[in-house]
A protein has these predicted regions:
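N-terminal beta-strand motif that seeds the catalytic metal site of vicinal oxygen chelate
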Residues: 1-25, 55, 71-73, 126-130
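Vicinal oxygen chelate
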Residues: 24, 73-121
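Amphipathic alpha-helical segments
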Residues: 25-38
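Short secondary-structure junctions
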Residues: 36-41, 94-98
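Conserved short beta-strand elements that form part of the metal-binding/catalytic scaffold
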Residues: 38-71, 121-127
């Protein structure tokens, strides 16, 4: 029996992540200047950044049904304490301190959370090898 096209479909790569914003200019400044993300381009009502090969799109919700709190976006960093200190120096409002989430067989998982200029929850994560 031959596999159908639907049997072969697998979502295995994120191409773009959208984050709803109320004030696009303020959000662009925050993601570019405060978080240090690489700005790609802007079109009316939308701005795009590169995040390690995944495109991040900022803009107002296209339709009312899309205007809802989003998922937590986690940025993977090599040194969570150094990144925390650097962003705190840029007045990022952290909700907590870097803390251990889980001990895995070969690494420890650390996280810390903050809100962006639009109130979206963001996180930093670091897998610290032992």
């Amino acid at each position: 029996m031959t596999a159908s096209v639907t049997d072969q479909v697998a979502l295995d790569r994120i191409g773009q992540i959208a984050i709803n914003v109320k004030d696009l200019a303020r959000a662009v400044r925050y993601y570019r200047d405060t978080l240090g993300m690489r700005f790609l381009f802007e079109v009316p009502n939308l701005a795009f950044f590169d995040c390690g090969g995944v495109r991040l799109m900022l803009g107002p919700a296209e339709k009312p049904e899309f205007d809802h709190p989003g998922s937590v976006l986690y940025y993977k960093v090599a040194d969570i304490n150094a990144t925390f200190a650097a962003l705190k120096g840029r007045d990022v409002a952290f909700i907590d301190e870097p803390h251990l989430i889980a001990r895995m067989p070969d690494h420890d998982l650390w996280m810390v959370f903050f809100r962006d200029s639009e109130g979206n929850m963001l996180g930093l994560m670091s897998e610290v090898r032992r």
